[in-house]
């Protein structure tokens, strides 16, 4: 039912993954109102839905402690400006999507001014910096959770929450059509194909591209006609990737696409960095190797704070190691190539067993996330 009330909603996202979540939520909310306006910070997807963005996510997207320190004065100024503008608009509700170090502090201040705040995507308090849960309790009226293992943490701390599943699980089919996707990307049905995703941030691309592509070279030397596909959506990242690989004699195709999961579903295996890409790969039912490397000094400083055995979402969701992970020194071309060679030569029984694991995990988070989030937001602005 469409409501005639005029509603003003503030949203802030800090990364591409938040832009994806944000645009789905905006589309769902638009169905409920005759007049609804969105203001804040978003990416091109959210702008395409007529959200008024005062800053672009590129101005927030940073990586590492040094990046935060260098950008701190600008970030603080942005936060002050956002608070001033949101108060002037008299928001009905504010939704901070992920990006916790910025959004939680913003939510805390808005809440003190009487604005209802929702935090969408739990910080990885189950992995490290668990004290952030207390900041969330002070800053927000409710937390929207994407994964089932998060709910018990919030229940123990007495923080209002709702497990809504993940929008990507609603978007990606339970049984991706590999044949059709191979036709879409012009991949012969009998061609062995590897998807490589070296990251979504410039720093990740800088660190991981050479390692990943030297791995690809080792595999192409071993597997005749192995096709390497690189799905990237950002022109700057594509240019950076091509520059970094210019001296490595490996054949590959860069696919300028917003739906990397389709490329992974078409591939026989994938090599990717940790993060949302591991979830997409699982939902695409594609065998994967997960790798990550960061500044060794930073890693030494934070290693004792990390509380989980695994970094990839498939392993965290399964509660056991169903995909291989290679971190820091173990993230080298030889180890990655050896593991991928094994995956690329999976027999049908091995492939089916892994895909069934992925299928059951997919079902566990396929819960109509945008609809659930919308209903909760309507309750908080007294429309349900």
UniProtKB/Swiss-Prot annotation:
One of its GO terms (molecular function) is lipid-A-disaccharide synthase activity. Its EC number is 2.4.1.182. It is an enzyme of class 2 (transferase). Pathway: Glycolipid biosynthesis; lipid IV(A) biosynthesis; lipid IV(A) from (3R)-3-hydroxytetradecanoyl-[acyl-carrier-protein] and UDP-N-acetyl-alpha-D-glucosamine: step 5/6. It catalyses: 2-N,3-O-bis[(3R)-3-hydroxytetradecanoyl]-alpha-D-glucosaminyl 1-phosphate + UDP-2-N,3-O-bis[(3R)-3-hydroxytetradecanoyl]-alpha-D-glucosamine = lipid A disaccharide (E. coli) + UDP + H(+); a lipid X + a UDP-2-N,3-O-bis[(3R)-3-hydroxyacyl]-alpha-D-glucosamine = a lipid A disaccharide + UDP + H(+). SUPFAM superfamilies: UDP-Glycosyltransferase/glycogen phosphorylase. It comes from the Bacteria. One of its GO terms (cellular component) is membrane. Keywords: Glycosyltransferase, Lipid A biosynthesis, Lipid biosynthesis, Lipid metabolism, Transferase. InterPro entries: Glyco_trans_19. Transmembrane segments: none annotated. One of its GO terms (biological process) is lipid A biosynthetic process. The keyword Nucleotide-binding does not apply. Belongs to the LpxB family. NCBIfam families: lpxB. Condensation of UDP-2,3-diacylglucosamine and 2,3-diacylglucosamine-1-phosphate to form lipid A disaccharide, a precursor of lipid A, a phosphorylated glycolipid that anchors the lipopolysaccharide to the outer membrane of the cell. This is Lipid-A-disaccharide synthase. It comes from Blochmanniella floridana.
